[in-house]
Amino acid sequence: FDVIKYQQKRLGTKKGFIAVKPNCSIQSYTPALAAWKEFGPKELVVTTYQAISGAGKTFKDWPEMEGNIIPYIGGEEEKSEQEPLRLFGKVVDGKIEKATAPLITTQCIRVPVLDGHTAAVFVNFEKKPTKEEIIDRWENFKGLPQELNLPSAPKQFIRCLLYTSDAADE
């Protein structure tokens, strides 16, 4: 909320503000990274698998997409590499100063799914956490909505579901 007071001053208003949401493909994994902040994520390799709804399409108006993938989505990789750094940055004199880490490398792929994006994320840390620490930080992570006890906020923001190869076969 730090940027809002600067925005209101610039716009000459005491109420209201302009809010933007992050790129849809990064929303699935940036909260998980925030939960691991103490371990110092230093490098990410991310592959996103983005549904056709992200392009504003349906299978009815994009039938050639059925059964196909597009291995490059123009502009998405740049956004996916830069926008998390803005989210992890800080407000200095009313402007967002991007974080300098982690170094993010992305590949964004359009897949023949109507709705929903998926991300495969590989992380290298400054301080390597144990599996138990990773799960604990996810299970106990509280975002700002939880801290403010907002009525629409889920009690547990991140849920960790563990699957073994045996469970996947069932």
Roles of regions detected by a PLM:
Residues 133-141:
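Short amphipathic alpha-helices in soluble, non-transmembrane regions
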Residues 1-65, 69-71, 103, 150, ...:
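N-terminal Rossmann-like NAD(P) cofactor-binding subdomain of oxidoreductases
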Residues 126-128:
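Helix N-cap motif at beta-to-alpha junctions
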Residues 122-124:
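Short hydrophobic/aromatic beta-strand micro-patches
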Residues 163-170:
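Conserved small/polar residues in nucleotide/adenosyl-binding loops
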Residues 30-37, 81-85, 89, 135:
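Predominant activation on well-ordered alpha-helical scaffold segments within soluble catalytic domains
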Residues 77-120:
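Oxyanion-binding "anion nests"
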Residues 141-162:
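Active-site-adjacent substrate-binding region
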